[in-house]
Amino acid sequence: MAWFLCLSVLVVLVLALAALLWRVRTRDRPQEAPSLPYLPVLGSLLSLRSPHPPHVLFKELQQKYGQTYSLKMGSHQVIIVNHHAHAREVLLKRGRTFAGRPRTVTTDVLTRDGKDIAFGDYSATWRFHRKIVHGALCMFGEGSASLQRIICTEAQSLCSTLSEAAATGLALDLSPELTRAVTNVICSLCFNSSYSRGDPEFEAMLRYSQGIVDTVAKDSLVDIFPWLQIFPNKDLRLLKQCVAVRDQLLQKKFEEHKSDYSDHVQRDLLDALLRAKRSAENNNTAAEFSAEAVGLSDDHLLMTVGDIFGAGVETTTTVLKWAITYLIHYPEVQKQIQEELDRKVGVDRPPQLSDRGSLPFLEATIREVLRIRPVAPLLIPHVALSDTSLGDFTVRKGTRVVINLWSLHHDEKEWTNPDLFNPGRFLSADGSSLTLPSSSYLPFGAGLRVCLGEALAKMELFLFLSWILQRFTLSVPPSQSLPSLEGKFGVVLQPVKYAVKATPRPGCHSGLFPANP
C-alpha cells in the first residue's frame, strides 16, 4: 500500500512538473492570430459578406476576433491590424521586415508589373527610385518659394473661377476645379507644365483618373483568383483602357523631356530621373550594376512619375473635397477659421506658408479632416519578407498585413466621440498651439513606406483652403440638402458630388492678389 501511495505521489509530481514546463515553454511563444472561418479555395470570402465597405466591416469584426486577426483571401493569409500599437510595429519597429508589397493583377496592370514606388516590392530598385524622387521633392522643399508660387498661382486661378460663378449666381461642382488646381501643381513638379480650363488633354486625364480610382484596389475577384483573367471582366477591361490613355500622355511628356534635356538644368521630377539614369549609364563600368539593374529603364521612369502624379493628385484633391464638405456641414468651424484669418492675415494680402504658425485653428481643422475621413482608410497592404512576429502573434513569410487606418482614427478608447468633427481635439486648452492627443493618428503612414508627398500635400491643403476661406463663405444652394458624409470607397474614400455656392465675403477682394506673395 505504501509503495502505491509513493508511486501516486511521484506520478502527480511528474505531471505537475510537465505541466509547469509546458506553460513556461509556451507562455512566451507567439501564437497564430485569431482567424475568421475559411474554406478551401474560397478562403474567408463568405465571412466577409456585408453591406458595409471593408474598412467599416474590419472595424466591426474586432469585437468578435480582437484588434488584430487574420483571414484568408483565396489562398493568401491576411492579417488585419486595427490598433495603433501593432500598426506602429508593422510600420516602424519591424518596418524593413514588413516592407514588401503583394503582386495583384490590377496593380500589375497599373504599374507595368510593379515598376513604381507605391506598389513596387521592396528591393534595391525600389530604394533607388525612392531616393531619387525624395531628392527631387527636396529640391522644391517644404517652404520653398518656387513651390509656394506654383500653389498660389493655382489658388488664385481657383478663386477667379469661384468669383465668376458667384457673379452669375451659379453653384459649382468643385470636384473638377479642385482636381485641375492640384493637377497643375503636380504637373509643374513632374513636367514643368500646367493645364487651362477645358484643355482636351486635361479632360482625358480626368476620365482616366476616375476610371483607375473606380477599378484598382477594390479587392476584386481577379486579384484574389488571378486565373479569372481568362473570362471577360468589365472592370479589368476599363482599367486597361484607362491605363493606356495615361501611358500615352506620360509617353508624350517623356519624349518632350528627352528631346530638350540638359544636364545643366533640372526643371522638374522627370529631369531628375533622366539625370539619374544617364549618370548610372555613364558610370556603370565602375559600378556593380547597370542602369537596368537598379530599375532605371524607361518603364521605371514612366511608372515612377505616373505614381507620383496619380497619387499626388487624387489624394490631395479628395482631402480638399472632404474639408469643404465638413466646413459646409459645420459653418461655425468655417466662421472660426475666417475670424482667425481676419485677425492674423487680414484682407490686404493673401495667406502664405509663413502664416501657418499663426493659424492653429485652420491647421487643426486640416488634421481633423485627415483623421475623420482618412483618404485611404485601408493602407496599401504590406507583406512579411521573412518569418517574424506581430505582438504575441507569429507571422509567416509572405503574409499580407493590412492596416485599417479607419479603425485607428475612430478608436473610441483613443478619441472622444470619434465620429464627431471637432478640430479642437488637436488644440491646446487655450487654443493657441497644436497638439497630438493620441498615437492612433497616422494619416500619411510611417516608416519606410511613409507617403513621400506628405510635406507637399500639407502645403497644398493649407494654401488652397486659406485662400478660399479668406475670400468666400461656402454653402449649398437653398434647394439642395447637405452633402452625404458617407463617401464612396475605392482607391480613396471620395465624397459624393454636389454643388457648392461660394459667397464673396464682405470687405474681401475676391479679385486677385498677386500670385507670388
Swiss-Prot record:
Annotated heme binding sites: 451
Task: Describe the family membership recorded for this protein in Swiss-Prot or TrEMBL.
Answer: Belongs to the cytochrome P450 family.
Name of encoding gene: cyp17a1
Entry superkingdom = Eukaryota
Query: One MF term from GO for this chain?
Result: iron ion binding
One Pfam family, short name please? Answer: p450
UniProt KW Heme keyword:
yes
> Protein name, please?
Steroid 17-alpha-hydroxylase/17,20 lyase
Pathway(s) served: Lipid metabolism; steroid biosynthesis
Per the UniProt record, the source organism is Oryzias latipes
Cofactors that this protein relies on: heme
Keyword Protein biosynthesis listed: no
Root EC class: oxidoreductase
Annotated EC: 1.14.14.19, 1.14.14.32
Q: Which GO terms describe its biological process?
A: hormone biosynthetic process; progesterone metabolic process; steroid biosynthetic process
Q: Which reaction does it catalyse?
A: a C21-steroid + reduced [NADPH--hemoprotein reductase] + O2 = a 17alpha-hydroxy-C21-steroid + oxidized [NADPH--hemoprotein reductase] + H2O + H(+); 17alpha-hydroxyprogesterone + reduced [NADPH--hemoprotein reductase] + O2 = androst-4-ene-3,17-dione + acetate + oxidized [NADPH--hemoprotein reductase] + H2O + 2 H(+); 17alpha-hydroxypregnenolone + reduced [NADPH--hemoprotein reductase] + O2 = 3beta-hydroxyandrost-5-en-17-one + acetate + oxidized [NADPH--hemoprotein reductase] + H2O + 2 H(+)
Keywords on record:
Heme, Iron, Lipid metabolism, Lyase, Membrane, Metal-binding, Monooxygenase, Oxidoreductase, Steroidogenesis
Upper taxonomic lineage: Eukaryota, Metazoa, Chordata, Craniata, Vertebrata
